[in-house]
């Protein structure tokens, strides 16, 4: 960090005789530091600057710049505070950007952190002239200290910003609200008494001033809101002239009570007893980068508490969705009125209209959130409730005589920008969750609490089963009869709650033990789209963690239905192939009638238990990145982008404007049907054969999952332009070793495609030195045959040309015509209304591999 203050030299015009008050703030840009890193506040007070020698001719003013490397450590080099004399750079008597350092001095912060200097101290500033330091100036330092930031002060300073109005920013919300709620952070064990930080009297005075100022602002805001509500309160005479006042006055009073209670919950420091300075002091969590994905805070009480986050949270079942965050502030004091209950019943009975109002309209989002909020139990504990799925209404009609809510949760949520990488896992266009909001079921938490018994001991394995289809329901029934650690998930909220709880328990184990935990084996039983949901949660959660977390979990793939990753694992591990890729297993979970005739259910349990106990070899599956750019909903709106991790296959389809229906905006609808294809496409099947074979929507093939209902299978022709860059082969890299830049070649395909498929799965079991992808395309070609008599050309269609291109490092795909939108299938999850997309062979964060357990790298002998 650096801060500059301009000072005038003696005798120079505009010299300042009064001290310049400045506050120095560090930009927290560190994520790889140790969990014990504690933010500190450096306070520096300068008294006088004395220039002993002439710095430069015709120098009228100088700038005092203070610079510190952040983070600084107690026992490491570079822990220095630099104070520099600088001047603005000039070119031909014109001031340009930048500063030139005239003299500099440094202070060892390791000594300051242990013994703050309160007396007078003189720092010599030296100028380097011909590699010989010459003392040219001196600075008198009154005080210099470095103190940990008080958790209580930070919360109090954040109070007026994050909880008063909508004028706060997202950065303030994340840094003060979300971070401090993360009670599973390693810093949470550092409960220190306030006297430990009591170094000097100015610190106490500053704390009391900050607390008094923030509480004054909160009280002023509350008084303004109360005065505003009373100003618009309808008098009883007016109510008597309209209707019976008994019908409306209680509702108004309940609304006011709800508002007051909400303000009291959100501003707990308004009253007298809370002003006593007797609470313990917590250090704030370590500074970190803005997360790639914005998820819920990893609270240790996550198995019991759920809350409302936003209407965008549950966007993509069965892909991960944010578990709500705000119910904690709404529980306890709310009373459900009859009017609200009637509103819930009416809105739940209204069917969803196909062409309703946009999802971002405040009417739709606010009404949905209000209904969902009031339906929650008064305690706010999810463990008390069963699954709650409430259809939202698309119409703006309300019951006659009913008043709207005076406050809504939407008004207290921070604005979330669209083009934000942190929001990339929140799909903003999913149709399923526009029609319903979900919260985790009680049975999920019951199963988790039964498996995760204590913080001191972690289970060896956990089996997550997707019970939203018949395959998962059948498998869960079989496994539960044998008392295996099964967690049944049937919605995005269930998956989110289960995975977040596992991560939270691992964090609590790390906080209680000095040794790292033994890797927890997490079996994922479901189709490809279910693994995609787990992968996104894995990337989201571990992007906030240190690299050590990459070794705390191992995943086991139990395929139920179409699963390209399972086919790949079968090609590198023959025992895995015999267990889960043989004909008996595929027939059992691909044909609905097969389960009724199955008598040997112990064989299923035996395969799974042998796989869990015997698969101890970690196969690092590379994670690729897909960046989708959606069309804007209005001309004034910018295009939104999403970053999606994937490990398997990406397929492309196209939607013509003529065949576009109201469902075109329903992107990211998971291709999970209750009936799976009886013959899932294998890796050896040609793309043309896949195109011609009729498959149900659950199959991720282009013909079944991407074609419009009005289009035939043979009419799936796509006019695309594909730009791709191929990485150099190992032999080419040796030949070009002398070159600095890695050679890449750009190629372009611009033609009519029958199918386009990009795979990140390695071509062989061994990981390549350079991360690359492979692309398989089937193009439609025309052969121009010359007719000599009429001398005209006649187009004759020939067989489709199939082509496989390997070694691709980056790929960009867009439609030939801008009005055509793409449908992209990423690991079994469909996304539509895509203008163009880009694929990169490697994920950009430190989470670059997905650890999967196999028996060993041994190819099958067949």
From Swiss-Prot:
Which residues are annotated with the PTM Phosphoserine?
Answer: 361, 387, 424, 662, 665
Which InterPro entries does this chain map to?
Phosphofurin_acidic_CS-1 (IPR019381)
Alphabetical list of Pfam families matching this protein:
C2_PACS_N, Pacs-1
Task: Output compositional bias ranges, type Polar residues.
Answer: 332-344
* Entry's Gene Ontology BP terms: apoptotic process; autophagosome assembly; protein localization to phagophore assembly site
Ranges of biased composition (kind: Low complexity): 263-272, 658-693, 700-710
Protein location: Endoplasmic reticulum; Mitochondrion
Keywords of the record, alphabetical order, are:
Apoptosis, Endoplasmic reticulum, Mitochondrion, Phosphoprotein
Segments of skewed composition (Basic and acidic residues): 313-328
Quote a single Gene Ontology cellular component term: endoplasmic reticulum
In residue numbers, the region (Disordered) covers 151-215, 263-436, 658-713
Q: What is its main location?
A: endoplasmic reticulum
Belongs to which family? Belongs to the PACS family.
Complex formation: Interacts with BID and PKD2. Interacts with SIRT1. Interacts with HDAC1. Interacts with TRPV1. Interacts with WDR37.
Q: What does this protein do?
A: Multifunctional sorting protein that controls the endoplasmic reticulum (ER)-mitochondria communication, including the apposition of mitochondria with the ER and ER homeostasis. In addition, in response to apoptotic inducer, translocates BIB to mitochondria, which initiates a sequence of events including the formation of mitochondrial truncated BID, the release of cytochrome c, the activation of caspase-3 thereby causing cell death. May also involved in ion channel trafficking, directing acidic cluster-containing ion channels to distinct subcellular compartments.
Query: What is the designated name of this protein?
Result: Phosphofurin acidic cluster sorting protein 2
Tell me what organism the protein belongs to.
Mus musculus
Gene that specifies this protein: Pacs2
């Amino acid at each position: 960090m650096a801060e500059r203050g301009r000072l005038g030299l003696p005798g120079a015009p505009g010299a300042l005789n009064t001290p310049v008050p400045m506050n120095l703030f560090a930009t927290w840009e560190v994520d790889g530091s140790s969990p014990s890193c504690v933010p500190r506040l450096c306070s520096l007070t300068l008294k006088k600057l004395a220039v002993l020698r002439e710095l430069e001719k015709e120098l009228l003013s100088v700038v005092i710049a203070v610079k510190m490397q952040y983070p600084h450590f107690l026992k490491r080099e570079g822990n220095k505070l630099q104070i520099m004399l600088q001047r603005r750079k000039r070119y031909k008597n014109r001031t340009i950007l930048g500063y030139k350092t005239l003299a500099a001095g440094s202070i060892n912060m390791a000594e300051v952190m242990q013994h703050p200097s309160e007396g007078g101290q003189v720092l010599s500033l030296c100028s380097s002239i011909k590699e010989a330091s010459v003392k040219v100036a001196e600075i008198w330092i009154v005080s210099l200290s470095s103190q940990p930031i008080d958790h209580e002060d930070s919360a109090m300073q954040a109070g007026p910003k994050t909880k008063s109005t909508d004028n706060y920013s997202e950065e303030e919300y994340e840094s003060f609200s979300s971070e401090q709620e993360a009670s599973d952070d390693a810093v949470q064990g550092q409960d220190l008494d306030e006297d430990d930080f009591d170094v000097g009297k100015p610190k106490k005075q500053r704390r009391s001033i900050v607390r008094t100022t923030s509480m004054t602002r909160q009280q002023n805001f509350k008084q303004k809101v109360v005065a505003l509500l009373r100003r618009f309160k309808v008098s009883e005479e007016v109510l008597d002239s309209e209707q019976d006042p008994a019908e409306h006055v209680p509702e108004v009073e309940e609304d006011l009570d709800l508002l007051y209670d909400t303000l009291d919950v959100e501003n707990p420091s308004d009253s007298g007893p809370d002003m006593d300075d007797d609470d313990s002091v917590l250090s704030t969590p370590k500074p970190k980068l803005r997360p790639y994905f914005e998820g819920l805070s990893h609270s240790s009480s996550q198995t019991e508490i759920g809350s409302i986050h936003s209407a965008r949270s549950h966007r993509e079942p069965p892909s991960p969705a944010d578990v709500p965050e705000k119910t904690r502030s709404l529980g306890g004091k709310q009373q459900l009125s009859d009017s609200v209950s009637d509103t819930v019943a009416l809105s739940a009975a209204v069917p969803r209209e196909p062409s309703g109002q946009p999802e971002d309209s405040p009417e739709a989002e606010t009404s949905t959130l209000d209904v969902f909020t009031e339906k929650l139990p008064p305690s706010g504990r999810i463990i008390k409730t069963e699954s709650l799925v409430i259809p939202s209404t698309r119409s703006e009609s309300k019951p006659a005589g009913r008043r709207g809510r005076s406050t809504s949760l939407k008004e207290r949520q921070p604005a979330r920008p669209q083009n934000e990488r942190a929001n990339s896992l929140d799909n903003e266009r999913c149709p399923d969750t526009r029609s319903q909001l979900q919260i985790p079921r009680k049975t999920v938490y019951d199963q988790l609490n039964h498996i995760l018994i204590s913080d001191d001991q972690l289970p060896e394995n956990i089996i997550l089963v997707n019970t939203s289809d018949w395959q998962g329901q059948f498998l869960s029934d079989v496994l539960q009869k044998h008392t295996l650690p099964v967690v049944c998930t049937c919605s995005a909220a269930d998956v989110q709650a289960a995975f977040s709880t596992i991560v939270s328990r691992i964090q609590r184990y790390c906080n209680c033990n000095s040794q790292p935990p033994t890797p927890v084996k997490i079996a994922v039983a479901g189709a490809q789209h279910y693994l995609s949901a787990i992968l996104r949660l894995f990337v989201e959660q571990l992007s906030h963690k240190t690299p050590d977390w990459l070794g705390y979990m191992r995943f086991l793939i139990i395929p139920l239905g179409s699963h390209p990753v399972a086919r790949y694992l079968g090609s590198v591990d023959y025992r895995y192939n015999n267990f889960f890729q043989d004909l008996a297993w595929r027939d059992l979970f691909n044909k609905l009638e097969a389960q009724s005739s199955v008598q040997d259910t112990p064989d299923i349990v035996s395969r799974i238990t042998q796989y869990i106990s015997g698969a101890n070899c970690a196969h690092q599956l590379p994670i690729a990145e897909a960046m989708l750019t959606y069309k804007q909903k209005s001309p004034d709106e910018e295009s939104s982008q999403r970053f999606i991790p994937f490990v398997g296959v990406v397929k492309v389809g196209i939607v013509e404007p003529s065949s576009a229906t109201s469902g075109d905006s329903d992107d990211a609808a998971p291709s999970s049907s209750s009936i799976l294809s009886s013959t899932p496409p294998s890796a050896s099947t040609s793309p043309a054969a896949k195109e011609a074979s009729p498959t149900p929507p659950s199959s991720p093939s282009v013909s079944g999952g991407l074609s419009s209902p009005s289009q035939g299978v043979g009419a799936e022709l796509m006019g695309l332009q594909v730009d791709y860059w191929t990485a150099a082969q190992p032999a080419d890299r040796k030949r070009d070793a002398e070159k600095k830049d890695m050679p890449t070649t750009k190629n372009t395909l611009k033609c009519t495609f029958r199918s386009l498929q990009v795979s990140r799965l390695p071509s062989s079991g061994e990981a390549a030195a350079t991360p690359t992808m492979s692309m398989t395309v089937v193009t439609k070609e025309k052969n121009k045959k010359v007719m000599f008599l009429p001398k005209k050309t006649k187009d004759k269609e020939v067989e489709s040309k199939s082509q496989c291109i390997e070694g691709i490092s980056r790929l960009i795909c867009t439609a030939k015509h801008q009005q055509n939108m793409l449908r992209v299938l990423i690991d079994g999850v469909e996304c539509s209304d895509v203008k163009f997309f880009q694929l990169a062979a490697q994920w950009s964060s430190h989470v670059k591999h997905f650890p999967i357990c196999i028996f060993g790298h041994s190819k099958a002998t067949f």
